[in-house]
């Protein structure tokens, strides 16, 4: 049986969850349509998603049509959940990008399309909600051409009045874009020779799969218009990106989830081989795990299975698998462009409203952060406050609601602040010697640190001979330094510096790698005190797309948010502004843009780097480490 994995992507409220329900219903996977409004859909399966009416986590379901099984990934539709979208993109064979006939191409649509093209995922445009009043499809087509891609082919004829219907396009005009994109076909056409339907279809298929042509289909998911045709298109157009001829196993974890019974579930896309129950499988070419229980989606329901084939999505109950873990041979993973998940840029303090719920809160945060790598937390050693870091304010709001509604923990939360970094100011050296108080460890370590240009990252080298200090001790020093770099003098990550391990001494047989591992961060702190550090704040590069009439306002407002516009382009009555802005200002700038353009602007951002800040440094509390904090305290007293 052919297995394909498709993604359903769209801006908020474009109808992607409703479309998924219609695909399941029309294929016979379910006997009754679910409703977003009634909370009975198969993919928005958490209480929070049903209450808010938006998809927050990746939902997975499936249907079978003739000899093809289709796994549907119903991805989130809000900007703060793009990390979840990007993780799901890596396992797709193709995508359906929904566009509301009423709303046209929205900001989120453009962001999602940018990601799909970057990762090389064949994409179909599906214009949804064609049954709404006041629809002008020619305007929607023009919107797609100007904001997404001009390389589209309209595959259907739509009759809106008096009786709405969608039929396959038979006119020759549908092939114009296909012909114009191929020199041989264009020359043949211009010379008056006839073009066979087969060669046009083959050229369309080639360009569709290399992401240079995008078919356009139409319908109404809510009223079941155009859905049967879409099912035929899905099963015939998309290919499975699997190694059918390979017997070696290869799969990748793309989602971690906790069930209502607190079972830890790992979602895996298989790219090669067959996975059997009770198999022992190597993870990321390291340790092995035994497959004791395995599930997959069959006609919209999770079912236990004994084996799974290449192309399938399987769910394992496992405590050790992590996001992006690879089962089996890593060399068999598809070579796709990787879109890096953005770093958390904000943090805040969160505490339970009822002190007796503190342990419940910590347990809940452990589960949530395990599922979402953009959400991190730690407990301050001095104040015992719980510090939460995240990407955006909507992610923060959803996390708070999740804590209350799923874990039944009421919380109090402070206004979030930006996450900074530190860089040494000058070169410095420091050594802590063995058996010299207050050093309790059987180790001597000497380190030097020197600043590097912004954006260099942390570089480490050892000038201590392996012939003198063996690899296990050397590795322990490096691990201790990496741990120490997580907290500089002001409590932030240390970056853009070179750290050299210059001196080491051990006593045989009492010295152990643990002595070096625990002493290294203490030496690092002392050498940073000699060097001093400066604070760096995150800057984002941005690209703003807005109607041309808002150019003056966008320029006028930029200085208010410390934004620096470095390039301006005009295209199709649209202005494209490029520049950079402090991360602490982006939320307000983006909100302002949305407001004065009436939602017609797009602001794409990514981390550009860190700039030196001015003014009073912002401090962050240190995280606890009971094994070295007392020693740190003693050294700080004498230095």
From Swiss-Prot:
Annotated GO molecular function terms are: GTP binding; GTPase activity
Q: What PROSITE patterns would the database entry show?
A: G_TR_1, G_TR_2
Residues annotated for GTP binding in this entry: 10-17, 74-78, 128-131
GO BP, sorted A to Z: response to antibiotic; ribosome disassembly; translation
Q: Which residues form the tr-type G domain?
A: 1-242
Q: Work out whether the entry's keyword set contains Translocase.
A: no
Alphabetically list the UniProt keywords.
Antibiotic resistance, GTP-binding, Nucleotide-binding, Protein biosynthesis, Transposable element
Checking PANTHER family in the record gives:
RIBOSOME-RELEASING FACTOR 2, MITOCHONDRIAL, TRANSLATION ELONGATION FACTOR G-RELATED
Similarity comment text for this entry: Belongs to the TRAFAC class translation factor GTPase superfamily. Classic translation factor GTPase family. TetM/TetO subfamily.
Q: What does this protein do?
A: Abolishes the inhibitory effect of tetracyclin on protein synthesis by a non-covalent modification of the ribosomes.
Please identify the protein, giving its name as recorded.
Answer: Tetracycline resistance protein TetM from transposon Tn5251
Please state the gene responsible for encoding this protein.
Answer: tetM(5251)
């Amino acid at each position: 049986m052919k297995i394909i994995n498709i993604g359903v992507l769209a801006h908020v409220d474009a109808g992607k969850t409703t479309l998924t329900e219609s695909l399941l219903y029309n294929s016979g996977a379910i006997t009754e349509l679910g409703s977003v409004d009634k909370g009975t859909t198969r993919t928005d399966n958490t209480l929070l998603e049903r209450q808010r009416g938006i998809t927050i986590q990746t939902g997975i379901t499936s249907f079978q049509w003739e000899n093809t099984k289709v796994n549907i990934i119903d991805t989130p539709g809000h900007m703060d959940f793009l990390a979840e979208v990007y993780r799901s993109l890596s396992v797709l064979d193709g995508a359906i990008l929904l566009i509301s006939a009423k709303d046209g191409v929205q900001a989120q649509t453009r962001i999602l399309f940018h990601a799909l093209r970057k990762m090389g995922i064949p994409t179909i445009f599906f214009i949804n909600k064609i049954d709404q009043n006041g629809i002008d499809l020619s305007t929607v087509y023009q919107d797609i051409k100007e904001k997404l891609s001009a390389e589209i082919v309209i595959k259907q004829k739509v009759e809106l009045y008096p009786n709405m219907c969608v039929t396959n396009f038979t006119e020759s005009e549908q092939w114009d874009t296909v012909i114009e994109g191929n020199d041989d076909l264009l020359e043949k056409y211009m010379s008056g020779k006839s073009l066979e339907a087969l060669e046009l279809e083959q050229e369309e298929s080639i360009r569709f799969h290399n992401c240079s042509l995008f078919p356009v289909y139409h319908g109404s998911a809510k009223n079941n218009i155009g859905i049967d045709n879409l099912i035929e298109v899905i099963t015939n157009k998309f290919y499975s990106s699997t190694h059918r001829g390979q017997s070696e196993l290869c799969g990748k974890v793309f989602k971690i989830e906790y069930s209502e019974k607190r079972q830890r579930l790992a979602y895996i896309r298989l790219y090669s081989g067959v996975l059997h129950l009770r198999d022992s499988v190597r993870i990321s070419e390291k340790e092995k795990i035994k497959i004791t229980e395995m599930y997959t989606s069959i006609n919209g329901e999770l079912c236990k299975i004994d084996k799974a084939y290449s192309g399938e999505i399987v769910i394992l109950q496992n405590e050790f698998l992590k996001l992006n873990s690879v089962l089996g041979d890593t060399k068999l993973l598809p070579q796709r462009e990787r879109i890096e998940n953005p770093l958390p840029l904000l943090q805040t303090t969160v505490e339970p409203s009822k002190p007796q719920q503190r342990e419940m809160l910590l347990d809940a945060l452990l589960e949530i952060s395990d599922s979402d790598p953009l959400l991190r937390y730690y407990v301050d050693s001095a104040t015992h406050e719980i510090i939460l870091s995240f990407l955006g304010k909507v992610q923060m709001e959803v996390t708070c609601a999740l804590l209350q509604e799923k874990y039944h923990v009421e919380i109090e939360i402070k206004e979030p602040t930006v996450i900074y970094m530190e860089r040494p100011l000058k070169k410095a050296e420091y050594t802590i010697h063995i058996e010299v108080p207050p050093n309790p460890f059987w180790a001597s370590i000497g380190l030097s640190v020197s600043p590097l240009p912004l954006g260099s990252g942390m570089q480490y080298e050892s000038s201590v001979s392996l012939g003198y200090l063996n690899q296990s001790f050397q590795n322990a020093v490096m691990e201790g330094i990496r741990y120490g770099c997580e907290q500089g003098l002001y409590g932030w990550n240390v970056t853009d510096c070179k750290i050299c391990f210059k001196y080491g001494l051990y006593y045989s047989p009492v010295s152990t790698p643990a002595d070096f591992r625990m002493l290294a961060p203490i030496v690092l702190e002392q050498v940073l005190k000699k060097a001093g550090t400066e604070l760096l704040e995150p800057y984002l590069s941005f690209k703003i797309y807005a109607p041309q009439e808002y150019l003056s306002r966008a320029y006028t407002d930029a200085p208010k948010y410390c934004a620096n516009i470095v390039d301006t382009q005009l295209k199709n009555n649209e202005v494209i502004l490029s520049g950079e802005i402090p991360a602490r200002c982006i939320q307000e700038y983006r909100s302002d843009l949305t407001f004065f353009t009436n939602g017609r602007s797009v602001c794409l951002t990514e981390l550009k780097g860190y700039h030196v800040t001015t003014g009073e440094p912002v401090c962050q509390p240190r995280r606890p480490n009971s094994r070295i904090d007392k020693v740190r305290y003693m050294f700080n007293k004498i230095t």
